[in-house]
Amino acid sequence: ERFAYDSYRRFIQMYGDVVLGVEHHNFETILADHKDEHGYSLDTDLTATDWKIIASAFKAKVEKELGEPFPLDPHEQLWGAVSAVFGSWMNDRAKIYRRLHDIPEEWGTAVNVQSMVFGNMGNTSATGVCFTRNPSTGENAFYGEFLLNAQGEDVVAGIRTPQPLTLAEKDLGHSDLPAMEEVMPEIFGELCDVREKLENHYKDMQDMEFTVQQNKLWMLQTRNGKRTAKASFKIAVEMADEGLITKEEAIKRIDPAALDQLLHPTLDPNAPRSV
């Protein structure tokens, strides 16, 4: 029951913001006020009853802002979501991005409609993002973070402190939180296999999103990962050495404009520090 109402309030919040245009902060204020009133510090502290109350408050807020109730018909909800994706092609942020990257406006965008898996079905479920190599340094080491009993938005929204993916990351970041390698060793092993397969297939460093639903791993997305200029050089050289790409391909992957990043003083990552 808790999972159902947690998922429902997430849907109302995201649909209300993205499709109906009710600003995100309206929902966050309702949630924050409820947590303060009941002495909760984390979203995971809330019960099924709490989420039921919040879902009703979210719907009431939508009706107050729009003058009409939150749509309950699944077909109306689906077409609203599809229309919102098509409409996003012409928002200001998308226009600026296309201009910066020389992407033609007439290309348009596509919509995928697919069933969803849930990372918030208890402590056998999780969600996370990861890179097949370190996007900051280019080191050939699995890199990423995840959250138990959460959905993908929680990882990027900063609502909860994410946990490291690997024990090496945990030690490097001096984290007190358990790594996925510790708490879900079998799933972590599957993820490592996927990491190798995808990088060998695409022949580039991959940025991946995943969900674990009741101890089953689901891959949601993969794409070529963004990286620093330093990482770009290291990844290109090492992939050529590994035989994944040719030396000619490695040279073509280096953006000449990125050379400027390497000509400035940088902090030594191994220097002693105090925080």
Predicted features along the sequence, with ranges:
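Nucleotide/phosphate-binding sheet-loop regions of phosphoryl- and nucleotidyl-transfer enzymes
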Residues: 1-274
